[in-house]
C-alpha cells in the first residue's frame, strides 16, 4: 500500500507552481534505476529491500531480461520539504544510459526542470557521463551531481576515509572540467559572434578604416560548477 494515496497526488497536480520534472542521467550501469527504485520506496510504492532488484521503471519485458534501461519512463512522487513543509509533486524520469538510446535521454532532458547526474565513484567520468552532461547543458537543465556506489571505495579499493575524501574531491574536479569545456565552447562562439557584429557596425560607420581595439567582457563562470558548499 503506497504511503501517499493517489488522491494526494491528484490534489498536488492542481498546484502547478509546486510541480517539478526531474530526470535521472548517467553512464550505463552507474546506478540510475537503483536510485529510482530507492526514491519509489520513499513513497511506499515498493519495499526498500527490493530497490535495485525489481527495476520498477524498466517496464518492458526486454528491459527486464537484458537488465538495462532502453526507454525513458516516469512516475509521480510526493516530496515534502523539511524546512518549510512545502509539498511538491516530483515527476521522476528514469532515462537510458547506453549510447544506443541517446534520443531517449534527449527527450527526458527536454521535459525536465532539473537532473540528477549520477557518477560511479570508481568508474568516474565515462563517455556517456560527458554526453548526458552536455545534453543537460544544451537544454539548460539544472543538474545536481550524485556520487554513487560509495561503498565500492571501501569494499573493493580498501580506501581510508581520507583517501576516499581526496578521491571524491578529484572526481568532482573531473566533472567540473567537463562543464568548463562546455562553458569555454559557448563563450568562444559568443565572442566570435560579438566580434563579427562589432566589425559590421565599424564598417557601417568607418568604412575600410582599421578597426580600433576591441575588448571582450569578462564573465563569471563560478555558478556552473558542482560544489558541496553550494549544495549541488
Q: Where are the regions that the model predicts?
A:
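Conserved C-terminal guanine-recognition region of P-loop GTPase G domains, centered on the G4
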Residues: 109, 114-220
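P-loop NTPase switch module centered on the Walker A-proximal segment
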Residues: 1-119, 157, 166, 173-177
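Glycine-rich, histidine-containing beta strand-loop boundary motifs that form or position
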Residues: 26, 37, 119, 145-149, ...
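Conserved nucleotide-binding/hydrolysis micro-motifs of P-loop NTPases
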Residues: 30, 42-45, 98-99, 122-125, ...
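Long, low-complexity, serine/threonine- and charged-residue-rich intrinsically disordered N-terminal tails
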Residues: 215-217, 222, 226-232
Amino acid at each position: 500500500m503506497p504511503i501517499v494515496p493517489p488522491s494526494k497526488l491528484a490534489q498536488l497536480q492542481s498546484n502547478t507552481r509546486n510541480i517539478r520534472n526531474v530526470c535521472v542521467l548517467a553512464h550505463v550501469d552507474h546506478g540510475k534505476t537503483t536510485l529510482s527504485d530507492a526514491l519509489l520506496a520513499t513513497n511506499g510504492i515498493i519495499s526498500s529491500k527490493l530497490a535495485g532488484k525489481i527495476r520498477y521503471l524498466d517496464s518492458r519485458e526486454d528491459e527486464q531480461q537484458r537488465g538495462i534501461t532502453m526507454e525513458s519512463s516516469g512516475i509521480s512522487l510526493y516530496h515534502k520539504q523539511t524546512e518549510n513543509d512545502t509539498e511538491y509533486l516530483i515527476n521522476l524520469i528514469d532515462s537510458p544510459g547506453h549510447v544506443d538510446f541517446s534520443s531517449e535521454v534527449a527527450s527526458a532532458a527536454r521535459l525536465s526542470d532539473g537532473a540528477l547526474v549520477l557518477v560511479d565513484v570508481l568508474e568516474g567520468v565515462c563517455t556517456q557521463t560527458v554526453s548526458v552532461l552536455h545534453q543537460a547543458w544544451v537544454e539548460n537543465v539544472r543538474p545536481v551531481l550524485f556520487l554513487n556506489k560509495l561503498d565500492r571505495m571501501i569494499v573493493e579499493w580498501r580506501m581510508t576515509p581520507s583517501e576516499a575524501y581526496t578521491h571524491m574531491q578529484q572526481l568532482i574536479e573531473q566533472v567540473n572540467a567537463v562543464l568548463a569545456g562546455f562553458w569555454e565552447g559557448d563563450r568562444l562562439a559568443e565572442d566570435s559572434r560579438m566580434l563579427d557584429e562589432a566589425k559590421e557596425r565599424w564598417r557601417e560607420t568607418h568604412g575600410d578604416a582599421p578597426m580600433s581595439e576591441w575588448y571582450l567582457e569578462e564573465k563569471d563562470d563560478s555558478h556552473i560548477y558542482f560544489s558541496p558548499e553550494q549544495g549541488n
